[in-house]
Amino acid sequence: MTAAAAPMPAGMPVISLREVTKVYDSGDSAVHALRGVDLDIASGESIAIIGPSGSGKSTLMHIVGCLDVPSSGEYELAGTPVSRLSNRELARIRNQRIGFVFQAYNLLPRASILRNVELPMMYAGVGRAERQTRARAALGKVGLAERAPHLPSQLSGGQRQRVAIARALVNNPSILLADEPTGNLDTQTGREILALFDDLGAQGHTVILVTHDMSVAAHAKRVIRIVDGRIADGPGGDEGDARPPA
């Protein structure tokens, strides 16, 4: 078994970005997705990153989740400069320290939901018996233990999102990144999913919700607003250099 990294003490910055930029080459022109972002997120904090389409919020999520790298600037995760990590080390972080929940669920359609939840542990080399035990426990946390043998097509949208959350939780990550987690759900189901994230935050997970919906952002303790690749001043949270409250 590969142990999950120990969480940092509550209140300590687990995520720290300094002057982070991201530029994409678009043929004859360059697209500046992020422009000098400074951001601290404390261990155990619950935040929302909001902004319209094209604002840079998804790019920021990809960098925070180690799915992409900055063009310039520095990103430290739990005190370690991410730029110094090898591809293998980055893959280990994505598998063990960060849990991802996507709007589209990203479930394998021909695999049972138990098998879907097992996947991160398969990549980590966990044995079959332990994988199944932990996957069933994760499904139990989201109220779907009895659905373990079912296929994703046999579940509602809300249930599929719960499976995605169980998969994100199965390696006991300290950070949960959710990209528009209620975007495909009806209002009542969306409330239930957000209540689940509220519970996970209360348990000490660092929860980051990426959304354009202020009703979703209202569940976070702090709101970061992104406009044109920059953290914006104005109503909606602790903007400016986006450091956590003292």
What are these regions (language model features)?
Residues 12-227, 231:
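ABC family nucleotide-binding domain
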